[in-house]
Amino acid sequence: MGKKKIATLSAILSLSITSGVSSTTAYADNKETNYINENDVKLNGKVSEALQSNMKIELENGMTKPIYSLDEAIIENLFVETEVDSDRDGKKDRVSVKVMRPKTDSNVKVPVIYEMSPYRAGLKDVPVYNVDEELYAYEGKPYGAVNLGSYGNYYVPRGYAVILGESIGTGKSEGCPTTGDEQEILGTKSVIDWVNGRAKAYKENGEEVKADWSTGNVGMTGVSYNGTLPNAVATTGVEGLKTIIPIAAISSWYDYYRANGAVIAPGGYQGEDTDNMAEAVLTRENPEVCGQVIKELTAGQDRKTGNYNDFWDKRNYVKDAKNVKASVFVVHGLNDWNVKTKQFAQWWEALGENNVPRKMWLHQGGHGGTSTNDWQRTQNKWFDYWLYGIENGIMNEPMVDVQRENKTWDKMKNWPDPSAVPSKVRMYLSNKAVNLPLSMGSVNKMFSFVDDAKMKSNQLVANPELEVANRLVYTMPVLQKDTRISGTPKISITGNIDRSVSNLTALLVDYGGAKPEIVTRGWMDPQNVKSIENSTAIQPGKDYTFTWDMQPDDYVFKAGHQIGVVLMASDYDYTIRPKAGTKLTVKLSEVTLPIVK
């Protein structure tokens, strides 16, 4: 597909984190009280006795409190040697990092909070893909010198070092951006290796610098791409990485740019893909040396078919959850249409299957974190527990916090809600909204709709009682009580297409408020009827059964409202937008909702 400059990537994924009590001092001094003997300090065994004797902190409410001066903070700009050569110049790439740490006595050691980012040197405006074209039919900026930033300003006074890095190919770092593959992972991992004495770092003048001030314990965090890299590095099982807090983070890049074989955009960034993402963050000197790497991204992502292949498999962290040794605190917005909710849901499930210590917050915001629910305090306690070994009760809290639509928070043992039951509803087909029984029924009608990619979803969900040629609408009876879903809705339809290619889109809609609200949605390429790995030639007019998932959600439909399902072909904001006219005929439709009993 050719490229056309119809938008820029000036803000791709880029977000910053919104972010009278007795005290106890625990410190190392040969002539004073040893940390481990402090009666008021409860330890959890996460830090060895040897390290405990080299730490100096003061606690308040079970958390580290600020005791170190920001004005005296030590700041170093260094280059850490990685084990990769992503720009293929015959030399190991070096990544640029800023290290900020408290000024301490020489025998005091501190843990590290670490964020790697491709965004520190800004983003370039690059062309993205033109999505107004036909579908493919299968045939057979440098750091500021004195600003410690939000992490540094908060955590350095509390006895933490903060390391901010520039990922390969960005800013002052060497190498080439590779959008989430092993080279990017290992480039990020190298900083943890350096903190633990397994890699080397240098000043700009070539002088080697050791991290002899560190305990070796590292916690990674970040939002969006910056939160994705912690997920990725955790799958290496690297020694020293004790915990991660991925916020609005990707767990599989395929599910960021594809859905069931369909080419899908991140919300707000139509036409974006792995190659122009890499181009946007390619802010190193001499970016032309990465030309071949970008070409390989273009080829590997296979935008033509949308199939899952080895390229995507290398960027799928979910399958490697078995290697995760760090604890994980997931934070995600239930209304995030950039990094969609499947990203947290599949990661959370995989972590649970592998007995990874975990915690999760799901908030009502979009792409980013949350400042509500006493977030900063909780983050502080989490890092203290895993990096300083403070027993502060954080792991005794319910594992999941979910923010409700009215902004209150519910605490849960797990997610999806263990009380959620997959409930199938076979829908009588009509081009008008009808009250449907919540039980199976015989169906002997069929109805058709015609694709028009220029019609936006808010138009297609409106006025469900009217016949509209470009959609089918089904509504269930008016709800007699609040009805909550928790998990992943699924759709299954039987029917045919009059062409060999189309998009398929399903919307789950809340009818009954001031205006229809799209709760969640899902997409499919019908040519992936058998698997996401392989396309199957679709015979026009032949009946097939297509089944696909919508994005996971936790949502309450209010009493007096109606649950609706809208079927359409192309989705203006997310799918490729082919010319109008494809006719789809549906003979049977069934939705499965994870209803909390």
From Swiss-Prot:
<dbReference type="Pfam" id="PF02129">
    <property type="entry name" value="Peptidase_S15"/>
</dbReference>
<dbReference type="GO" id="GO:0008236">
    <property type="term" value="F:serine-type peptidase activity"/>
</dbReference>
<dbReference type="InterPro" id="IPR008252">
    <property type="entry name" value="Pept_S15_Xpro"/>
</dbReference>
<protein>
    <recommendedName>
        <fullName>Putative Xaa-Pro dipeptidyl-peptidase</fullName>
        <ecNumber>3.4.14.11</ecNumber>
    </recommendedName>
</protein>
<keyword id="KW-0031">Aminopeptidase</keyword>
<dbReference type="GO" id="GO:0006508">
    <property type="term" value="P:proteolysis"/>
</dbReference>
<dbReference type="InterPro" id="IPR005674">
    <property type="entry name" value="CocE/Ser_esterase"/>
</dbReference>
<feature type="active site" description="Charge relay system">
    <location>
        <position position="336"/>
    </location>
</feature>
<dbReference type="GO" id="GO:0004177">
    <property type="term" value="F:aminopeptidase activity"/>
</dbReference>
<dbReference type="Pfam" id="PF08530">
    <property type="entry name" value="PepX_C"/>
</dbReference>
<dbReference type="InterPro" id="IPR000383">
    <property type="entry name" value="Xaa-Pro-like_dom"/>
</dbReference>
<dbReference type="InterPro" id="IPR013736">
    <property type="entry name" value="Xaa-Pro_dipept_C"/>
</dbReference>
<dbReference type="GO" id="GO:0008239">
    <property type="term" value="F:dipeptidyl-peptidase activity"/>
</dbReference>
<dbReference type="InterPro" id="IPR008979">
    <property type="entry name" value="Galactose-bd-like_sf"/>
</dbReference>
<feature type="active site" description="Charge relay system">
    <location>
        <position position="367"/>
    </location>
</feature>
<comment type="similarity">
    <text>Belongs to the peptidase S15 family.</text>
</comment>
<keyword id="KW-0378">Hydrolase</keyword>
<keyword id="KW-0645">Protease</keyword>
<feature type="active site" description="Charge relay system">
    <location>
        <position position="224"/>
    </location>
</feature>
<keyword id="KW-0720">Serine protease</keyword>
<dbReference type="InterPro" id="IPR029058">
    <property type="entry name" value="AB_hydrolase_fold"/>
</dbReference>
